[in-house]
Amino acid sequence: MAQVNIEKRGNVYQYRFEIAPQGGKRKFINKSGFKTKSEAQEAGNIAYTEYINAGVPFKECKLSYSDYLDYWLDNYCKSNLKYNTICKYRTIIDKYIRPRLGLYRLSTLTSVRLNMFITEICDEYSFSRSYFKNILKVVKGTFRDACNLYGFIKYNPALTLRLPKMDIEKKDPKHLYTQEEIDKILFRFRYNDTFTCSFLTSCYTGMRTGEVFALTWDDIDLDKGVISIKHSIYDKAKDIKGRWYLGSTKTLSGERLIYISQTLLSALKNYKAKQDYLKQLYGNKYIYYYLEDGKNQYGKVIEKRIVQKTEETKNQITLNLVFTKSDGKFTGTDITKYPFEIIHKELGIEKCRFYDLRGSYATKVLNSGVEIRDVADMLGHRNIETTENYYVSSTDTSRKCATDNFDKMIQSEVINEISEYLVF
């Protein structure tokens, strides 16, 4: 290193390098007693590296990138990320990153090689841009933590890594439900209380699908007309106790309080009255659930599994789930699967999803004149850019209205007269 100077003092060598000035005076670190110049140089390089790392000794990591990826999943992901995110990252690592980069040492991977990897992936696969971004996010995250969190590498080679410019085939746009489609769906399923009420809840609140089916009656104040959104559900591999879990909302801002319209409030009151009647009708055959705590397969994170009550667990606190079948059975988001097959095939409303009600709600509310900041808050977004980029779409009606409004704004006698001159 050019910063480390080696000097011979008598029969031995010393290293010397300058450090930050103190009190306006130049300061140096030196050490003598080395028999050879090369010994002094090596020791000086190590000392200088420790100095620029604020006194933390730096040891070159001999881990393969493959082993480090496992280390990162076990030590960072399991403590900081949600189960589904960990599963998604593990899939990306095992399918795309490990086979191409895993054999190299972590410390030998350079920004050039990482850029080559990203380019190869983008050329070889036709994923959506968002999925390419997820691959990039994993690569950048692993190297960021290797450098800043664990000190395995001195510099972060992924710091400036980015996706190349590329033409991504556009997917089908999100479906914006028309009022005619909503009416058609509600009429078709007018006798399916659970689906109809869950559909209305999403339609009138813009809640995420997982948030809708995580609702309990304790979250809904029918007297004040408000819903407290605190949880979301997610599923895992099914076992004897089921596969549905109650987790936190997608983001911290996802926890929110939303007001219920009179239409939805009336529907929820009627639905609850019928559910209470069915509980009495089924008696001890009605199915109830409770929450069971346990650690996930990755270690420390406590999960809350939705478990059916038995004779042994009948004294557990009941989870008053809102959207269940007539006998109380909870099937999570699966309750929408069959209805949407009917919607696609019988009603002819193709390529629509339950989740699209969220985007339809956002678009309609914004077009009604509500400020975008308020819309973002109602949807549980951290920033308005998410609302603008992913959930707010224009409609033929809104574009026609905008054109008509602009036409009225610039109307004048001169323009009208000019138009008359253009008549053939």
Task: Report each predicted region and the residues it spans.
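Short, charged phosphate-coordinating catalytic segments
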Residues: 2-3, 144-156, 182, 200-233, ...
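N-terminal DNA-binding module of tyrosine recombinases/phage integrases
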Residues: 9-14, 19-107, 112, 274-318
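N-terminal core-binding DNA-recognition domain of tyrosine site-specific recombinases/integrases
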Residues: 61, 73-145, 149, 171, ...
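DNA breakage-rejoining catalytic core of tyrosine-based enzymes
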Residues: 107, 153-155, 165-187, 230, ...
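C-terminal catalytic core of tyrosine-transesterase DNA break-rejoin enzymes
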Residues: 148, 200, 204, 210-211, ...
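Catalytic-site neighborhood detector that most strongly recognizes the C-terminal catalytic loop/helix
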Residues: 168, 176, 233, 359-360, ...
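C-terminal secondary-structure termini that scaffold catalytic or DNA-interacting sites
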Residues: 224, 235-237, 243-255, 262-264, ...
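C-terminal catalytic core of Y-nucleophile DNA break-rejoin enzymes
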Residues: 226-228, 246-270, 287-305, 316-340
